[in-house]
From Swiss-Prot:
Domain of life: Bacteria
Protein known as: Major cold shock protein CspA
PROSITE patterns: CSD_1, CSD_2
Domain CSD residue range list: 5-64
Entry GO terms, CC: cytoplasm
Organism this protein belongs to: Bacillus cereus
Sorted UniProt keywords: Activator, Cytoplasm, DNA-binding, Stress response, Transcription, Transcription regulation
Gene: cspA
Subcellular location: Cytoplasm
A GO MF term: DNA binding
Induction: In response to low temperature.
Amino acid sequence: MTVTGQVKWFNNEKGFGFIEVPGENDVFVHFSAIETDGFKSLEEGQKVSFEIEDGNRGPQAKNVIKL
């Protein structure tokens, strides 16, 4: 299931961050889940669509697309 959220924060040096989803817990996002060519990064406040999977430490984003 694809959901839409907004990037809460993303650390380019560490390569991860979190996405806010209304009515849900924040979702962890790793740079490897971002669907783009070149440098994979997200900006705070940016809208994204993605799928949620169960990661080792809770919900994790996959197939992240910048909107």
